[in-house]
């Protein structure tokens, strides 16, 4: 996500605390809230906004759900708003109204993550998807009975994205079958898969991309993780298999 913007927010500018609720602050706060409500919440703005993120097909918060907008003429009373993902404020507009209009604070989001996050103040605890790196969050696959795996999601530097979006439970409860099926297929043909790994790391990056996508039906490079759900988890699973299952 960080490739979409050249600038970043280094300070939330104004934090709405009780001690800061002066008349001037309230006046400008109301102006920003009205401007967002009347202009940036419109269907035309939503369409322009999502056009910026044409290659972002998966929610940048959870990487679990597709977020592609669908544009059609009005049908059974539905308009663009009903056919698009949510626009999420990383710093909540209820707390940082001056950032409600900042493109650096806006992200496409699945409805699930938007509702979970709600008005939670992310300033000191979470990291924006614009700033996230591949190793900020990692997936571990712990052995259980019957050759199954427990999916564990871990964070670097104590960022709270995992706790906020409940990623640990969601990934394990919802996507365990996906992971366990990959393990099952790998263990059926260990010799063939060892040959695959040996060949894989001797190839060019472009060829690796093609070979990886053919086998795992997902993207190998971090820059492409937003193109398809579960891409980050699948990449971590691939390296777990390389280092632990097919030595």
List each language-model region with its residue ranges.
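Short metal-coordination and nucleic-acid-contact micro-motifs, chiefly zinc-binding Cys/His arrays
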Residues: 52-56, 102-106
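N-terminal accessory alpha/beta regions
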Residues: 1-47
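Histidine-centered nuclease catalytic patch
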Residues: 63-105, 119-123, 128-134
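Short, intrinsically disordered, charge-biased short linear motifs at domain edges
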Residues: 42-50, 94-100
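Domain-level detector of nuclease and nuclease-like folds
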Residues: 116-170
């Amino acid at each position: 996500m960080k490739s979409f913007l050249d600038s970043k927010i280094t300070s939330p500018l104004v934090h709405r605390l009780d001690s800061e609720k002066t008349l001037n602050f309230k006046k400008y706060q109301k102006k920003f809230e009205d401007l967002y409500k009347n202009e940036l919440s419109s269907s035309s703005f939503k369409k322009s906004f999502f056009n910026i993120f044409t290659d972002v097909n998966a929610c940048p918060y959870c990487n679990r759900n597709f977020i592609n907008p669908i544009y059609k003429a009005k049908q059974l009373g539905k308009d663009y708003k009903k056919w698009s993902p949510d626009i999420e404020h990383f710093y909540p507009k209820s707390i940082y109204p001056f950032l409600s209009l900042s493109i650096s604070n806006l992200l496409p989001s699945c409805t699930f993550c938007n509702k979970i996050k709600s008005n939670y103040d992310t300033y000191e605890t979470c990291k924006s998807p614009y700033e996230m790196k591949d190793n900020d969050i990692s997936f571990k696959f712990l052995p259980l009975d019957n050759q199954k795996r427990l999916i564990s999601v871990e964070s670097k530097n104590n960022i709270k994205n995992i706790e906020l979006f409940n990623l640990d439970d969601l990934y394990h409860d919802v996507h365990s079958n996906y992971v366990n099926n990959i393990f099952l297929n790998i263990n059926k043909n260990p010799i063939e898969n060892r040959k695959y790994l040996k060949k894989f790391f001797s190839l060019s990056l472009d060829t690796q991309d093609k070979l990886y996508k053919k086998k795992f039906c997902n993207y190998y490079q971090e820059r492409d993780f937003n193109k398809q759900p579960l891409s980050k988890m699948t990449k971590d699973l691939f390296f777990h298999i390389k280092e632990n299952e097919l030595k």
